[in-house]
């Protein structure tokens, strides 16, 4: 018999302790992984609701199970809010992740073996944009494009490659690029060769929703995103379009269900609905602008301290610190900073001589620290501490000093105040 007072602490202390330790880690560590963020208690409330019990294969009004009248309301709210947020005429909120959303786009628009133009992973792309170890690289003929010597996307080279190889689909979007992407230019190139333009905006969706980064939805045939990262919602995916093409919309829906998934996660879709509503609030725009301001402030200090930033700066939420030429790998930098309670991730940089498991760079992002309330002053102070460690990564005294400073700063800015 189920009772409301059942809890994990009494029943499964081993698991409970792991959860508590992770909660403490989040409170006592500064999170700088560009793809991570803190979601709101409202989103977590939705995800912990009894919606988790309901199977709802199909779409609102067209379910394969009974008892879906209320989950239909939930999913419709999420769909309509997503459309409003990004100026779309179509939204599918069922993908369990960004990668699931991306695989649905491939399935809807392509056949195995078709040619696809995607950003080189080593230049800032994503696994699902054609990496040989991913389904995208295994099933499709991937032609990569990259960045030029200045660290910016080379659109002339992109056009040359597109005309030469005539891909059926071009992919815009990134996981480690700090510039502004010219979506209109990419659509112009796609139209020249009769290709689909597919944009994966996962990293910058929150910035786009707030109007502080260009919106790809008016330019692309189809756009995908995660619902966490800068959007600060639950872990999941979404597919959007403003193509006014009902045939395309049907293909996308079929590629999600039954093509790639069965029952949707209704508790997560409820979390998405809450997050989209939060993103429509005026304070969300203030938050996203601060995300960019904090990233620019961090870049300023890195450059002052003599560190190279790929592309020389940032126009979004992230930066890539290039350690080529220094006696320090990305893996070592990641570990040293982690010892001081600063969480980053090692990341390959353009022309990286080291393997992806070692790398010559670290990727840093500001969504999570901004969510805690950091402004430019705290971001600059933090960057100074990071540089202190990178300057002397094998010095335990430096690491201990910075760790103490980090703990004090975290206490001033709790994740959930």
Swiss-Prot record:
Protein name as annotated: Serine hydroxymethyltransferase
GO biological process, one term: tetrahydrofolate interconversion
Organism annotation: Shewanella sp. (strain W3-18-1)
PROSITE patterns xref list: SHMT
Similarity section: Belongs to the SHMT family.
Pathway: One-carbon metabolism; tetrahydrofolate interconversion; Amino-acid biosynthesis; glycine biosynthesis; glycine from L-serine: step 1/1
Phylogenetic classification of the source organism: Bacteria, Pseudomonadati, Pseudomonadota, Gammaproteobacteria, Alteromonadales
Site (Plays an important role in substrate specificity) location in chain: 228
Catalytic reactions on record: (6R)-5,10-methylene-5,6,7,8-tetrahydrofolate + glycine + H2O = (6S)-5,6,7,8-tetrahydrofolate + L-serine
HAMAP family: SHMT
